[in-house]
UniProtKB/Swiss-Prot annotation:
Disulfide bonds: none
Catalytic residues as annotated in Swiss-Prot or TrEMBL: H193 (proton acceptor)
Catalytic reaction equation(s): (S)-lactate + NAD(+) = pyruvate + NADH + H(+)
Organism: Anas platyrhynchos
Name of the molecule in the record: L-lactate dehydrogenase B chain
One matching Pfam family: Ldh_1_N
CDD domains attached to this UniProt entry: LDH_1 (cd05293)
SUPFAM superfamilies xref list: LDH C-terminal domain-like, NAD(P)-binding Rossmann-fold domains
HAMAP family: Lactate_dehydrog
Amino acid sequence: MATLKEKLMTPVAAASAVPSSKITVVGVGQVGMACAVSILGKGLCDELALVDVLEDKLKGEMMDLQHGSLFLQTHKIVADKDYAVTANSKIVVVTAGVRQQEGESRLNLVQRNVGVFKGIIPQIVKYSPNCTILVVSNPVDILTYVTWKLSGLPKHRVIGSGCNLDTARFRYLMAERLGIHPTSCHGWILGEHGDSSVAVWSGVNVAGVSLQELNPAMGTDKDSENWKEVHKQVVESAYEVIRLKGYTNWAIGLSVAELCETMLKNLCRVHSVSTLVKGTYGIENDVFLSLPCVLSASGLTSVINQKLKDDEVAQLKKSADTLWSIQKDLKDM
């Protein structure tokens, strides 16, 4: 007796069992779900997998997204605490970890999160050995280093979301003061995602016009217009949002979706993301910091050799020293 489906359809060829643009999000907290929704909203993947240890919440989030499938271009959304569900992922976004508390420095989080990552990273590599891992959990630069060490993957396939969001915040705040759209204001935040990030004032421009040439004091304490306040706002913005709503999620979710889009579509766009910087700008230790990097289908394929002023290089080295002072004491690696 033929089933309804057999009466409805005549098979012609076997459907592909392997997804071509699968993305996994590890961790279904506020940040993880913002990443998932932003990725789905862009229609980037043919399959989305979610992983978490909280089974009820995980199943609930999966079902909630599945029920919206009619409005999406991703027809397959799966979830499980077993990492087998992540098999054949092109990109794995890691958002899991203990959450930052109000007023807590990102660096204070690190040792608490190392233990969490030991249960995550080897499982990712087991089921998706050819994936690129995008680390979002804070403190992101050190946890990207931890991921690189635990995964055994080449450095171009372990990337931290880094200062991509800091750069977006910077461009937004600069553009607000200038009365233009953020896409028309070009500037970069490098170094550590967080307290010791570096604003590259020498490179800020609008339509190729250097703002520091118009105002040589820009970014210094001698600036009567106090543009340095913009970078201070960038550094403090996450803490402010956490104070107001308890966490940050939407901006980082949108930032992560853009990074995934650049890699999946092989767009070769330049992003400020965390990468191994040993050997650049006189940095001697195995630390991950954000530099302008070209992302493609292969992962991180090039680093832009940005011309920095001496004080900017000094700040970058200070960022590296800040991170290394924590990293060198990490245990169970």
